[in-house]
Amino acid sequence: MKFASKKNNQKNSSKNDERYRELDNLVQEGNGSRLGGGSCLGKCAHVFKLIFKEIKDNIFIYILSIIYLSVCVMNKIFAKRTLNKIGNYSFVTSETHNFICMIMFFIVYSLFGNKKGNSKERHRSFNLQFFAISMLDACSVILAFIGLTRTTGNIQSFVLQLSIPINMFFCFLILRYRYHLYNYLGAVIIVVTIALVEMKLSFETQEENSIIFNLVLISALIPVCFSNMTREIVFKKYKIDILRLNAMVSFFQLFTSCLILPVYTLPFLKQLHLPYNEIWTNIKNGFACLFLGRNTVVENCGLGMAKLCDDCDGAWKTFALFSFFNICDNLITSYIIDKFSTMTYTIVSCIQGPAIAIAYYFKFLAGDVVREPRLLDFVTLFGYLFGSIIYRVGNIILERKKMRNEENEDSEGELTNVDSIITQ
């Protein structure tokens, strides 16, 4: 078995060596053309060669990123449309969605997941890890729920991008990730670009904003980071099935979501505020709205008033589409963390901010929440793409360095074996 695994490792390393050797040759060609005073056209052709080589070698992750981005954009748009229709019943929609997720994941897992079970997964209970992920997600939702009440839309978008440095810090501290200077530079470019754009937009709006609630919203990113790291540890160490993890996490979230109920009674929640004596009535009205299409809140409601107006007609269709895209979002997120890493998911997910902003330009996607195009959204998108390219360059350098270290270790091991044979 050791011989077979060693043979596979050598095969994989030789394949990677070939990739990086080609990359080195392209880089050296570029250096030669610069030293020889090559034409501008030749330099551009060389850059396009490097880009084509990178895309060809990592085509799967790029296709997966595009699929994830599409699903994520649709998830956020239908979440917004669901909120506009039945925003008075957040607890009902949350619990119903968790129940649907649990049923769907368990059905699919029972049909397809059991065949993939391994010995580590079969002989160990992961209930503690599942519960920990659910609790971390619940803590994140509660903090975000409070923080969003006094955080403007532009600041919300900026806070989302802060997940990059927060994840980098905790992954370095706990998972022992190591970064190149270009990783830090790329992350800074993404965060600073979006910070400048969103700060400018925040000055143009007159919405209520509070630094304390902004900090509460930022703190919501920490449990999300630990939740994703727990997923990565479970995936990488125990090779647990993605469907099983999502099914069990959804099961525990049915109970951990109940922790949010007392939060609704906080008086500063404005339209989401719900007194204790109205909780049960709100739940009954929520189910009537979602499944029967019956409006309850129709008077003294609307923008800037104590309550949102119900728009329950066809709400179940919008909610069903939201649930579908959210389930797909969860599956792809887990897959990216499983096959790649928490940081890969973080970098990929941060493009959703500018992408969602642009998606709201199209009425067939956004529906009633459509808005006019803004130049600053495209500036944000460009900043993200440029920062991501720089970040990826740092990863390539680290991968090449890792391959060289493995080569040196293999060659040292072979020399040791030869020496031992000679001495015998």
From Swiss-Prot:
PANTHER family, per database record: PROTEIN CLT2, CHLOROPLASTIC
Glycan attachment residues as annotated in the record: 88
The entry's keywords: Amino-acid transport, Disulfide bond, Glycoprotein, Ion transport, Iron, Iron transport, Membrane, Transmembrane, Transmembrane helix, Transport, Vacuole
Membrane topology according to the record: Multi-pass membrane protein
Effect recorded for residue 72 to R: Reduced sensitivity to quinine
Parts of the chain that traverse the membrane: 59-79, 91-111, 128-148, 155-175, 179-199, 210-230, 249-269, 318-338, 347-367, 378-398
Listed result of changing residue 76 to I: Reduced sensitivity to quinine
Vacuolar side, ranges: 80-90, 149-154, 200-209, 270-317, 368-377
Outcome, altering residue 207 to A: Abrogates pH sensitivity of chloroquine transport
Pfam families to which the protein is assigned, alphabetical: CRT-like
Descriptive protein name: Chloroquine resistance transporter
Biological source species: Plasmodium falciparum
Subcellular locations according to the entry: Vacuole membrane
Single annotated GO MF: xenobiotic transmembrane transporter activity
Reported regulation of activity: Transporter activity is trans-stimulated by host-derived peptides containing 4-11 amino acids. Trans-stimulation by hemoglobin-derived peptide VDPVNF is pH-dependent and sodium-independent. Saquinavir trans-stimulates transport of hemoglobin-derived peptide VDPVNF. Protons are non-competitive inhibitors of chloroquine transport.
Family in the record: Belongs to the CRT-like transporter family.
Function: Nutrient transporter. Substrate transport is pH-dependent. Can transport arginine, lysine, histidine, peptides, histamine and spermidine. May modulate activity of endogenous transporters. Involved in maintaining the osmotic homeostasis of the digestive vacuole. Required for the asexual intraerythrocytic proliferation of parasites. Can transport Fe(2+) and Fe(3+).
Major localisation: membrane
One GO cellular component, as annotated: vacuolar membrane
GO terms of biological process kind: amino acid transport
Assembly: Monomer.
Catalytic activity: L-arginine(in) = L-arginine(out); L-lysine(in) = L-lysine(out); L-histidine(out) = L-histidine(in); histamine(out) = histamine(in)
Effect of residue 163 to R: May repel chloroquine from moving through the channel, leading to higher chloroquine accumulation at its site of action
